[in-house]
Amino acid sequence: MKKLLVPLISLCLMAASVAARADAVETLRDFIRDVKTGRAQFTQVVTSPDGVKKKSSSGTFEFARPNRFRFAYAKPFEQLIVGDGQKVWIFDADLNQASSRKFSSALGATPAALLAGGALDKDFDLAVLPMRDGLDWAQATPKQKDGAFKSVALGFRGKDLAVLDIHDAFGQHSVLTFSQLATGINFAADAFRFTPPAGADVIEQ
Protein backbone atom coordinates (compact mmCIF):
# COMPACT_ATOMS: atom_id res chain seq x y z
CA MET A 1 0.00 0.00 0.00
CA LYS A 2 2.84 2.37 0.85
CA LYS A 3 4.45 1.65 -2.52
CA LEU A 4 1.24 2.70 -4.26
CA LEU A 5 0.76 5.75 -2.06
CA VAL A 6 4.03 7.41 -3.06
CA PRO A 7 3.36 7.30 -6.82
CA LEU A 8 -0.20 8.51 -6.24
CA ILE A 9 1.06 11.46 -4.19
CA SER A 10 3.66 12.22 -6.87
CA LEU A 11 1.01 12.15 -9.59
CA CYS A 12 -1.21 14.49 -7.58
CA LEU A 13 1.66 16.93 -7.05
CA MET A 14 2.56 16.81 -10.74
CA ALA A 15 -1.05 17.46 -11.71
CA ALA A 16 -1.26 20.39 -9.29
CA SER A 17 1.97 21.83 -10.69
CA VAL A 18 0.74 21.59 -14.29
CA ALA A 19 -2.58 23.18 -13.33
CA ALA A 20 -0.80 26.07 -11.58
CA ARG A 21 1.49 26.68 -14.55
CA ALA A 22 -1.41 26.47 -16.99
CA ASP A 23 -2.79 29.59 -15.33
CA ALA A 24 0.00 31.66 -16.93
CA VAL A 25 -1.75 31.73 -20.31
CA GLU A 26 -5.05 32.56 -18.64
CA THR A 27 -3.30 35.28 -16.64
CA LEU A 28 -2.04 36.74 -19.93
CA ARG A 29 -5.53 36.62 -21.43
CA ASP A 30 -6.98 38.23 -18.30
CA PHE A 31 -4.33 40.96 -18.36
CA ILE A 32 -5.02 41.82 -22.00
CA ARG A 33 -8.80 41.72 -21.48
CA ASP A 34 -9.16 43.40 -18.09
CA VAL A 35 -6.28 45.87 -17.70
CA LYS A 36 -7.24 48.76 -19.95
CA THR A 37 -4.65 51.33 -18.88
CA GLY A 38 -1.34 51.26 -17.06
CA ARG A 39 2.02 52.85 -16.34
CA ALA A 40 5.32 51.30 -15.25
CA GLN A 41 9.02 52.02 -15.02
CA PHE A 42 11.17 49.72 -17.12
CA THR A 43 14.75 48.70 -17.69
CA GLN A 44 15.78 47.08 -20.95
CA VAL A 45 18.85 44.98 -21.67
CA VAL A 46 19.57 44.02 -25.29
CA THR A 47 22.14 41.30 -25.93
CA SER A 48 23.78 40.88 -29.34
CA PRO A 49 23.43 37.59 -31.26
CA ASP A 50 26.92 36.50 -30.19
CA GLY A 51 25.97 37.06 -26.55
CA VAL A 52 28.86 39.45 -25.97
CA LYS A 53 27.57 43.00 -26.38
CA LYS A 54 24.89 44.33 -24.07
CA LYS A 55 23.07 47.65 -24.17
CA SER A 56 21.02 48.91 -21.24
CA SER A 57 18.33 51.58 -21.21
CA SER A 58 15.50 52.67 -18.94
CA GLY A 59 12.40 54.79 -18.92
CA THR A 60 8.63 54.81 -18.55
CA PHE A 61 5.99 52.74 -20.35
CA GLU A 62 2.32 53.77 -20.56
CA PHE A 63 -0.58 52.18 -22.42
CA ALA A 64 -4.29 52.63 -22.98
CA ARG A 65 -6.13 49.96 -24.90
CA PRO A 66 -6.93 49.76 -27.66
CA ASN A 67 -3.76 50.54 -29.58
CA ARG A 68 -2.25 53.43 -27.64
CA PHE A 69 1.11 53.31 -25.92
CA ARG A 70 4.16 55.39 -25.06
CA PHE A 71 7.74 54.26 -24.39
CA ALA A 72 9.71 57.22 -23.02
CA TYR A 73 13.40 56.27 -22.85
CA ALA A 74 15.34 58.48 -20.45
CA LYS A 75 18.75 56.76 -20.26
CA PRO A 76 21.30 56.55 -21.80
CA PHE A 77 19.65 59.02 -24.21
CA GLU A 78 16.17 60.37 -24.74
CA GLN A 79 13.94 58.64 -27.24
CA LEU A 80 10.17 58.52 -27.53
CA ILE A 81 8.01 55.86 -29.19
CA VAL A 82 4.31 56.71 -29.32
CA GLY A 83 1.42 54.75 -30.79
CA ASP A 84 -1.78 56.77 -31.14
CA GLY A 85 -3.88 54.07 -32.81
CA GLN A 86 -3.30 55.49 -36.29
CA LYS A 87 0.46 55.95 -36.45
CA VAL A 88 3.58 54.99 -34.54
CA TRP A 89 5.99 57.87 -33.98
CA ILE A 90 9.66 57.57 -33.06
CA PHE A 91 11.38 60.74 -31.87
CA ASP A 92 15.12 60.96 -31.25
CA ALA A 93 15.77 64.03 -29.10
CA ASP A 94 19.53 64.13 -29.77
CA LEU A 95 19.01 64.23 -33.54
CA ASN A 96 15.78 66.25 -33.32
CA GLN A 97 14.32 63.76 -35.79
CA ALA A 98 10.85 62.22 -35.89
CA SER A 99 9.62 59.39 -38.07
CA SER A 100 6.19 57.83 -38.40
CA ARG A 101 4.57 54.76 -39.93
CA LYS A 102 1.03 53.50 -40.13
CA PHE A 103 0.12 51.65 -36.95
CA SER A 104 -0.71 48.34 -38.63
CA SER A 105 2.44 48.19 -40.75
CA ALA A 106 4.72 49.37 -37.93
CA LEU A 107 3.59 46.86 -35.34
CA GLY A 108 1.86 43.85 -36.89
CA ALA A 109 2.18 40.90 -34.53
CA THR A 110 4.79 42.37 -32.17
CA PRO A 111 5.15 42.58 -28.37
CA ALA A 112 4.07 46.23 -28.48
CA ALA A 113 0.94 45.30 -30.43
CA LEU A 114 0.25 42.51 -27.98
CA LEU A 115 0.47 44.86 -24.99
CA ALA A 116 -1.54 47.55 -26.74
CA GLY A 117 -4.43 45.15 -27.24
CA GLY A 118 -3.77 43.13 -30.36
CA ALA A 119 -5.79 40.08 -31.38
CA LEU A 120 -4.09 37.71 -28.95
CA ASP A 121 -5.30 34.29 -30.09
CA LYS A 122 -5.64 35.37 -33.72
CA ASP A 123 -2.07 36.63 -34.05
CA PHE A 124 -0.16 34.44 -31.58
CA ASP A 125 0.27 30.81 -30.59
CA LEU A 126 0.27 30.67 -26.79
CA ALA A 127 2.04 28.18 -24.55
CA VAL A 128 2.84 27.74 -20.88
CA LEU A 129 6.50 27.81 -19.83
CA PRO A 130 8.02 26.46 -16.60
CA MET A 131 8.10 28.78 -13.61
CA ARG A 132 11.43 30.57 -13.12
CA ASP A 133 12.74 33.48 -11.09
CA GLY A 134 9.57 33.30 -9.01
CA LEU A 135 7.40 34.22 -12.02
CA ASP A 136 4.72 32.41 -14.01
CA TRP A 137 5.54 32.45 -17.71
CA ALA A 138 3.48 32.38 -20.90
CA GLN A 139 5.02 32.36 -24.36
CA ALA A 140 3.52 34.10 -27.38
CA THR A 141 4.82 33.13 -30.82
CA PRO A 142 3.55 35.04 -33.88
CA LYS A 143 1.63 32.87 -36.32
CA GLN A 144 3.17 34.79 -39.21
CA LYS A 145 6.76 33.61 -39.37
CA ASP A 146 8.17 36.44 -41.50
CA GLY A 147 8.01 39.15 -38.85
CA ALA A 148 10.74 40.95 -36.93
CA PHE A 149 10.63 38.75 -33.85
CA LYS A 150 10.45 35.04 -33.09
CA SER A 151 8.83 34.88 -29.68
CA VAL A 152 8.15 36.74 -26.46
CA ALA A 153 7.89 35.21 -23.01
CA LEU A 154 5.79 37.18 -20.53
CA GLY A 155 6.55 36.75 -16.83
CA PHE A 156 3.80 37.45 -14.32
CA ARG A 157 4.05 38.04 -10.59
CA GLY A 158 0.53 37.20 -9.55
CA LYS A 159 -1.65 39.15 -11.99
CA ASP A 160 0.98 41.82 -12.71
CA LEU A 161 3.19 41.78 -15.78
CA ALA A 162 6.80 41.81 -14.57
CA VAL A 163 9.06 40.86 -17.50
CA LEU A 164 9.10 40.67 -21.30
CA ASP A 165 11.75 38.29 -22.66
CA ILE A 166 12.01 38.81 -26.42
CA HIS A 167 13.93 36.92 -29.10
CA ASP A 168 13.91 38.69 -32.45
CA ALA A 169 14.47 37.42 -35.97
CA PHE A 170 17.98 38.91 -36.05
CA GLY A 171 19.22 36.86 -33.11
CA GLN A 172 19.05 39.64 -30.53
CA HIS A 173 17.73 38.95 -27.05
CA SER A 174 15.92 41.75 -25.19
CA VAL A 175 14.68 41.67 -21.62
CA LEU A 176 12.34 44.39 -20.33
CA THR A 177 11.79 44.37 -16.58
CA PHE A 178 8.86 46.39 -15.24
CA SER A 179 8.49 47.95 -11.80
CA GLN A 180 6.03 50.25 -10.02
CA LEU A 181 3.19 49.03 -12.24
CA ALA A 182 0.00 51.04 -11.75
CA THR A 183 -3.24 50.22 -13.57
CA GLY A 184 -6.62 51.85 -14.02
CA ILE A 185 -5.09 55.25 -14.78
CA ASN A 186 -7.22 58.04 -16.25
CA PHE A 187 -4.91 59.48 -18.88
CA ALA A 188 -5.49 62.90 -20.42
CA ALA A 189 -7.13 62.85 -23.85
CA ASP A 190 -3.88 63.90 -25.53
CA ALA A 191 -1.55 61.63 -23.53
CA PHE A 192 -0.79 59.45 -26.55
CA ARG A 193 -0.68 62.19 -29.13
CA PHE A 194 2.64 63.25 -30.61
CA THR A 195 3.42 66.51 -32.41
CA PRO A 196 6.96 66.90 -33.77
CA PRO A 197 8.79 69.84 -32.17
CA ALA A 198 9.34 72.93 -34.28
CA GLY A 199 12.40 72.54 -36.47
CA ALA A 200 12.52 68.75 -36.22
CA ASP A 201 13.25 66.65 -39.29
CA VAL A 202 10.12 64.62 -40.02
CA ILE A 203 10.13 61.39 -42.04
CA GLU A 204 6.76 59.81 -42.80
CA GLN A 205 6.61 56.33 -44.29
Language-model regions: role of each:
Residues P7-A16:
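Bacterial N-terminal signal peptides
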Residues V18-K54, N67, P196-Q205:
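N-terminal leader/targeting segments and the immediate start of mature chains
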Residues V35-T37, S56-S58, A64-P66, P76, ...:
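Extracytoplasmic
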Residues T60-A109, S174-V175:
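An acidic-aromatic
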Residues S99, A119-D125, L129-Q205:
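Gly/Pro-enriched, hydrophobic low-complexity segments
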